[in-house]
Design a protein with these regions (language model features):
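Bacterial N-terminal signal peptides
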Residues: 2-12
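Solvent-exposed, well-ordered amphipathic alpha-helical segments
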Residues: 10-11, 27, 267
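Hydrophobic residues within membrane-embedded alpha helices
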Residues: 12-13, 132
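Serine-esterase "nucleophile elbow" of acetyl-processing enzymes
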Residues: 14-73, 80-93, 97
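Residue-level recognition of conserved structural "scaffold" positions that shape functional pockets
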Residues: 43, 72-75, 109, 265
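Phosphate/oxyanion-binding active-site loops and adjacent basic polyanion-contact surfaces
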Residues: 75-76, 259
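Alpha-helical cap/lid subdomain in secreted, periplasmic
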Residues: 81-283
Length: 283
């Protein structure tokens, strides 16, 4: 009996201790910051879909796109200061800043329009310089095309602004995602009818008829309507106002399908022009 007990103790002593936990390898996270207008912001642009579906869990993605903003007004209102603070947040190995403007820098937008030859490129250069000074990697994007058609051909009304972005990217050696060229080629191949399926809201019958004839971008004039009785004033609400989503149909902004489409385009282009980003992208 004593011999069996001694054998048991000897066997127990010879059992190897459990293996130690492997050393913890700390992650090396990156951050992607989106800076731009409504064609990039959530619910009307591609940015929300990009952050939600095209970035891995090893990168934070912050969409700071703001509807109606230009290179001038985005800075003037303080949105760029918010972006700079995001760039300076510690803990990230790489911080990438995607900058896309052009739509609201065009003429006819008081407080937002910029001079194409001087002010617009100067504003872009300043964004690039300050992003680099904050330790971030700026990436310029040409503006998403509008889906205007005339006689079956897409109207390239943003080409001069896209050219200016390309010139600044070349001059300052900034990675460039030529979203304008890529989106214009895609929309041209679709044609006005199919391209309309990527818009917020729904077109009316006149707009559908115009698209079938190869045209889009301007709503045909409606016949004069009989004056309607004034609607009663809505009762005041104690609830705070909520943000506007903007469901009106147009040929600039994107619904969910459109956002998904062009988020994929941006992810693929980023993987090509900046291969170091591939591990954090889902093309």
């Amino acid at each position: 009996m004593i011999g069996l007990f001694a054998a048991f103790l000897l066997q127990a002593a010879s059992v190897a201790p459990p293996p130690a936990d492997p050393p913890v390898v700390r992650i090396k996270p990156s951050k992607i910051i989106l800076v731009g207008d409504s064609t990039m912001q959530v619910n009307s642009g591609w940015g929300g879909s990009f952050c939600a579906t095209r970035v891995t869990s090893f990168a934070a993605c912050v969409d700071l796109g703001r509807g109606g903003r230009s290179t001038k007004s985005y800075r003037a209102e303080g949105s760029w200061d918010i972006a700079l603070n995001e760039m300076k947040t510690p803990g990230y190995v790489h911080v990438y800043v995607l900058i896309q403007f052009g739509h609201n820098d065009q003429p006819g937008k008081p407080g937002r329009s910029t001079d194409l030859a001087t002010e617009f490129p100067a504003n872009l250069r300043r964004y690039v310089t300050e992003a680099r000074a904050a330790g971030a990697i700026p990436i310029l994007l040409t503006p998403l095309t509008r889906r205007y058609f005339k006689d079956g051909q897409i109207t390239r009304d943003l080409d001069p602004w896209a050219d200016a972005v390309r010139a600044v990217a070349k001059e300052m050696k900034v990675p460039l995602v030529d979203l304008n060229a890529r989106s214009a080629a895609i929309i041209q191949a679709m044609g006005p009818v199919l391209a309309g399926h990527y818009s917020l809201g729904l077109p009316d019958a006149a707009m559908v008829g115009s698209a079938l004839a190869g045209n889009s971008g301007e709503k045909p004039p409606a016949p004069p309507a009989a004056p309607a009785a004034p609607a009663p004033a809505p009762a005041a609400s104690a609830l705070p106002k909520v943000g506007m989503r903007g469901d009106g149909f147009d040929y600039t902004h994107l619904n969910r399908d459109g956002a998904d489409l062009f988020a994929g385009v941006v992810a693929n282009e980023l993987a090509l022009v900046l291969p170091e980003m591939r591990p954090i992208l889902i093309p």
